[in-house]
Amino acid sequence: MKIYRAFPMAFSHLGQRTNNQDYLYPNVDKATEQTELFVVCDGMGGADKGEVASKLLCEAVADYVITMGNPTLDAAHIQVILNRAYEAYRTYLAQNPLLSRMGSTLALLQLHQQGATICHIGDSRVYQLRAGQVIFQTKDHRQVEDMVEAGIITATQALTHPWRNRLSRAVMASVTDKEGEPVKLMADIVTLTDVQAGDYFFMCTDGVLEAIDTYILETVLASNMPDQAKSESLQALCSAHSKDNYSGYLIGISYVAHTDSAQSIHTITNYAD
């Protein structure tokens, strides 16, 4: 299939923080209708150079895809990218001995002839919406999510649990990592083969989620406003209600040639040996 995109809308703001630890690829105002790869990262911990971690991870993704000639990403490609990001972290830590660790979330969207590949680690999200409804959403890698699934706490309790912001997965390196020890980085990878004209993909860091829930997102994207106005509406809500950095990408699908009527989803969870 051939996927034609509207002009992508991106934003990244401080919120009520003193520095922005989110990073986007392409940077704000750099994407075009021809852009196929979108990356949203949220660095962890101000003292641990979260803004550097998110930038290094975005750069690892972009550099790999450009160097390899824009391959359709699969689990093997993603693992190479994560290994390179991990090594970039290790190098930075070695050059900055006052730091003990660094890490970032990852949300990745690649549009290609087979549809859309989505990869994520942590709690930065990717949504697919159609006709004003979310039809796909990544699952946050948070400790409370695992506790809910295990029946330890309820979904309601998770909302106020003291561990609600703790990640169960992230792209992370620490000075305590042993040299030569196998890298254990985990990514959820999904390929969506049902992409249709009028669909939206929305990617965001968790700061956006302080202001925007599923109902609000569906309502805004179902409106008759142009894409720029939709993006501005989401940003206005975040400006009013988000304490954290908030960043996102809104990608509208304008036309798809040879769209299949049925949705096929192939999910791979990749664990490094």
Please provide the spans of the model-predicted regions:
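PP2C/PPM-type serine/threonine phosphatase catalytic domain
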Residues: 1-273
